[in-house]
């Protein structure tokens, strides 16, 4: 069974940077050693945003974007190696999620698409890459997401305490770690995605630092109720979603009914939308004693405060409190999934994704020996 140093690479729906994590992994433990966040050039970020909202690209443009993202991921890995004074031979493999540009797990031909050419990463780092983690699960009738609950269960489950892990990235997803029950998990809806999109359009800022804009505004209750009527929120699990659904166009359609509103009030309402949709799903799933939050949203003081109010009786904390950086959780999970793939172990949980069976995930892109 392969063990040693692994690198996880994650570029999520928030598009706030490429997260790269170095860890030692074996069958008994996962120990994080180092991490860094690598910036995404504005031009690349905009190209991904455009394609996620349905902008048409030529095959040439699509191929160029795939290559550019692969090179970006390789640059991020090489920066971490240099920082840690490590060579390619010191790393067993890289687990690279890729950049999701479309996720449509239902319909006549279910599919999900993550780009960022893994061949570019192998060629530029000299390290074996495991990628394309989601499509096998979809081929077996699953949602292909979320995949991180399996990792949360391995690291954070407790024999007697009802726990849930909440990742607030662009999309928010919940892992249900309830003693005596199968692991559950699904996407609750938008996390930071709509908040980030709004403040970017209105103020040219990538995100609402310390929730300053949202805290300066007031929740527009009719707008909140209008957004909460979206059918996704009442859809039963298993379910997953992404930027192709909850995007700026979605927000604009709801705002048409509310002309002339204060932009800060919209920001406050979007924060409340995220908090309410998460808390409702926690309660519908039976509640928990401890909710451990990770992802960029765990650094949003307004979101954390609202979750504590909406979930009275639940200890709301970050995963940092149990020794796992909330900023690095997803990248660490894909390093772990790469380890499982190389070990021939399944990486999905049918109780989460709805797949017909457990399966080894991903494709292996071997480096030259």
Swiss-Prot record:
SUPFAM superfamilies: Actin-like ATPase domain. ATP binds at residues 12-19. It comes from the Bacteria. Its EC number is 2.7.1.170. It catalyses: 1,6-anhydro-N-acetyl-beta-muramate + ATP + H2O = N-acetyl-D-muramate 6-phosphate + ADP + H(+). Pathway: Amino-sugar metabolism; 1,6-anhydro-N-acetylmuramate degradation; Cell wall biogenesis; peptidoglycan recycling. InterPro entries: Anhydro_N_Ac-Mur_kinase, ATPase_NBD. GO terms for biological process: 1,6-anhydro-N-acetyl-beta-muramic acid catabolic process; amino sugar metabolic process; peptidoglycan turnover. Pfam families: AnmK. Keywords: ATP-binding, Carbohydrate metabolism, Kinase, Nucleotide-binding, Transferase. The keyword Kinase applies. GO terms for molecular function: ATP binding; kinase activity; phosphotransferase activity, alcohol group as acceptor. Belongs to the anhydro-N-acetylmuramic acid kinase family. PANTHER family: ANHYDRO-N-ACETYLMURAMIC ACID KINASE. Catalyzes the specific phosphorylation of 1,6-anhydro-N-acetylmuramic acid (anhMurNAc) with the simultaneous cleavage of the 1,6-anhydro ring, generating MurNAc-6-P. Is required for the utilization of anhMurNAc either imported from the medium or derived from its own cell wall murein, and thus plays a role in cell wall recycling. This is Anhydro-N-acetylmuramic acid kinase. It comes from Shigella flexneri.
């Amino acid at each position: 069974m392969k063990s040693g140093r692994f690198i996880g690479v994650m570029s999520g729906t928030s598009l706030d940077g490429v997260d790269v994590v170095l860890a030692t992994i074996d069958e008994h433990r996962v120990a994080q050693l180092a991490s860094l966040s690598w910036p995404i050039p504005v031009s690349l970020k905009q190209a991904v945003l455009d394609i996620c909202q349905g902008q048409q690209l030529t095959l040439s443009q699509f191929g160029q974007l795939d290559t550019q993202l692969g090179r970006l991921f390789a640059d991020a890995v090489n920066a971490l190696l240099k920082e840690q004074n490590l060579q390619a031979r010191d790393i067993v493999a890289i687990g690279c999620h890729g950049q999701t540009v479309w996720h449509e797990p239902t319909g006549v031909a279910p599919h999900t698409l993550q780009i960022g050419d893994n061949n570019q990463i192998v060629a530029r780092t000299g390290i074996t890459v495991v990628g394309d983690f989601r499509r096998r699960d979809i081929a077996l009738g699953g949602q292909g997401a979320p995949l991180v609950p399996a990792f949360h269960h391995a690291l954070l489950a407790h024999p007697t305490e009802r726990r849930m892990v909440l990742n607030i990235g662009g999309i928010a997803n919940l892992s249900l770690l309830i003693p005596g029950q199968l692991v559950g998990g699904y996407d609750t809806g938008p996390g930071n995605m709509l908040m980030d999109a709004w403040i970017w359009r209105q103020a040219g800022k990538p995100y609402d630092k310390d929730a300053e804009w949202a805290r300066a505004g007031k929740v527009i209750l009719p707008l909140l109720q209008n957004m909460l009527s979206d059918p996704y929120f009442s859809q039963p699990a298993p379910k997953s979603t992404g930027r192709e659904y909850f995007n700026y166009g979605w927000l604009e359609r709801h705002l048409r009914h509310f002309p002339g509103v204060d932009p800060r009030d919209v920001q406050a309402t979007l924060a409340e939308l995220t908090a309410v949709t998460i808390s409702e799903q926690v309660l519908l799933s039976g509640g928990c004693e401890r909710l451990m939050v990770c992802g960029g949203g765990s650094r949003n003081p307004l979101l954390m405060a609202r979750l504590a109010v909406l979930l009275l009786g639940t200890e709301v904390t970050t995963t940092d409190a149990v020794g796992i950086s909330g900023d690095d959780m997803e990248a660490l999970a894909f390093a772990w999934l790469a380890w499982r793939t190389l070990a021939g172990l399944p990486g999905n949980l049918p109780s989460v994704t709805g797949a017909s069976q457990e399966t080894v995930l991903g494709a292996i892109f071997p480096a030259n020996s």
